[in-house]
C-alpha cells in the first residue's frame, strides 16, 4: 500500500508514485549560515495562511542575505505571490521585482539568494518552482521547512540544484546542504521570548509570560483589596458608616507589616535610581528646549531675510 502525504495545499499526494528528485552521492559546493529570523518568518507566514484558509497551506517566499565566495549567509526573507495553474505553482515575477526594489532600499548590502517553501520531502513540484527561480538568479538556494513534523530536531533542510544524467537526459536534481545557525546580538534578544516556550505542548505562553501574568493577577487583587480598605476608612471618617475597631486594628497592623528599608545600601541604590530618572527627564527637557530654540531661530532668520529684502527694495526708490 503506497504511503500518502499532504503537499501543503490540502491535497493528498502518493509519495511512492512520485519520482525522486534527490541527487545521490553529491557533496555541497557552498557553506550556509542560517539566521533564526528566517525560520521565524517562514513559520509566521505558514501560521497566518493556515489561520486564514482554515487548513494547512503551502507558502512560498524569497531568501535574502550575503554571499562571499562559497560562504552564504541567509539573513532575512519576504513573502512571494504565487498561483496554481493546472496543479502547477507559478510565481508572480512582477511582484518579486517590486519587492526586490523595496528591500534593496532598506537592505542595501543584501542580495537575493533563493527561495523557501513548506512541506515534506522535495518533489517534482519543487523542481518546477526552482526552475522559475533559476530564471531570476543563477544557482539559487532552496530551503524547505516541515511545520507538521513531530521530531525534536529542527525541521529545516537546505538544498542546491545540480544537473545529472537520468535515463540519458539532463535532469535537474537537488543536493542537500549542511548548514549552521548564526545569530547576532539584536537577533538573540528578539528571539529570546520564543526560545523560552514551555514544554506543555500548548505553545501559547512562555515561562516569562506566565510568570508576569501571575504577578499581574496578584498585584491586581492586592490593589482592589487596598482600595476597598481605603474606601472604608474614608467612609468611617466621614460618618457614612460606623467605626469597626476590629477592622481598623487589622488595617493598622497591615500597614505596620509593610517592610521599611532604611539601610545604607537601599538609600544609595534609591538615590542612584532617582538621579537616573531625574537625568533622563532633564535630558528630555533639554532636547525639547533645543527643538523649540531651533524653530525660533529658523523663524527669526526667515523674518530677518524678509525685512532685509524690504529695506533693499525701499532703497531702490530713494
UniProtKB/Swiss-Prot annotation:
Q: Where in the cell is it found?
A: Cytoplasm; Nucleus
User: Where does the record place the MPN domain?
Assistant: 32-165
- Top-rank taxon, per record: Eukaryota
Matching CDD domains: MPN_CSN6
Sorted alphabetically, the Gene Ontology BP terms of this entry are: protein deneddylation
What are the protein's GO molecular function terms?
A: metallopeptidase activity
Name the family the entry cites: Belongs to the peptidase M67A family. CSN6 subfamily.
Principal localisation: cytoplasm
Q: How does the annotation summarize its subunit structure? A: Component of the CSN complex, probably composed of cops1, cops2, cops3, cops4, cops5, cops6, cops7, cops8 and cops9.
Check the record and name the InterPro entries matching this protein: EIF3F/CSN6-like_C, JAMM/MPN+_dom, MPN, MPN_CSN6
Q: Does the keyword Nucleus apply?
A: yes
Give the lineage: Eukaryota, Metazoa, Chordata, Craniata, Vertebrata
Q: Which GO terms describe its cellular component?
A: COP9 signalosome; cytoplasm
Q: Sorted alphabetically, which keywords does the UniProt record give?
A: Cytoplasm, Nucleus, Signalosome
Give the function comment from the record. Component of the COP9 signalosome complex (CSN), a complex involved in various cellular and developmental processes. The CSN complex is an essential regulator of the ubiquitin (Ubl) conjugation pathway by mediating the deneddylation of the cullin subunits of E3 ligase complexes, leading to modify the Ubl ligase activity.
Q: Under what name is this protein listed? A: COP9 signalosome complex subunit 6
